[in-house]
A protein has these predicted regions:
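Non-transmembrane alpha-helical segments in soluble domains
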Residues: 28-31, 55, 159, 163
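Short amphipathic alpha-helical segments
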Residues: 10-12, 103-107, 139-144
Length: 171
């Protein structure tokens, strides 16, 4: 090798002949956790069960609307003044496919309200209870029960806290 470094251009320049010891050590720990959990098969089964259970709990919410009712509400940004009172109450539906083979473990909740800030308020309310969700603007919150460490109780708490937050925001 010459004494001067001459990098290879492009993505090939990022190749390594030996991985970092720290990177491999953290990978080993992660693989050991997956091995203890039974690897991918049992984790996927548990993921399907947890996600289905969370979906069932969310569908029991007083603020949940069916796919049919959600379709009637969709042009929300064009709500007329006569429709305003009908859509004042916060509501949500699940837009993730119901078939477990057509989705991962995440459920996307689409929120309906005349309040443009509803999704942000709900997300902040959930965070105050320790429920971590992911936001997609303008009005979707994604909740994901993770098979490695979430429990049935976590799903029950998440659904309960969502109900409490929406109740607090209901005018």
């Amino acid at each position: 090798m010459p004494p001067d470094f001459s990098p290879i251009r492009g993505a090939q320049g990022l190749q390594l002949s030996n991985p970092s010891v720290l990177g491999v050590a953290s990978l080993l720990g992660s693989l050991q956790v997956f091995q203890e959990a039974g690897m991918v098969g049992p984790l996927r089964t548990r993921s399907i069960e947890l996600t289905a259970y969370l979906g069932k709990l969310l569908a029991q919410s007083a603020y949940f609307v069916s796919a049919h009712e959600a379709a009637m509400r969709l042009p929300l940004c064009a709500v007329s003044s006569t429709d305003h009172d009908q859509h004042r109450r916060p509501a949500f539906t699940i837009i993730t496919p119901s078939d477990a083979n057509s989705r991962g473990s995440q459920l996307s909740l689409l929120f309906f309200s005349s309040d443009a800030e509803l999704m942000h308020k709900v997300l902040e309310g959930l965070r105050s209870y320790g429920v971590i969700g992911d936001e997609r603007h303008p009005n979707v919150i994604r909740l994901t029960p993770t098979a490695l460490y979430n429990t049935v109780q976590d799903c029950e708490n998440g659904a309960k806290y969502l109900e409490e937050v929406l109740k607090e925001l209901d005018i």
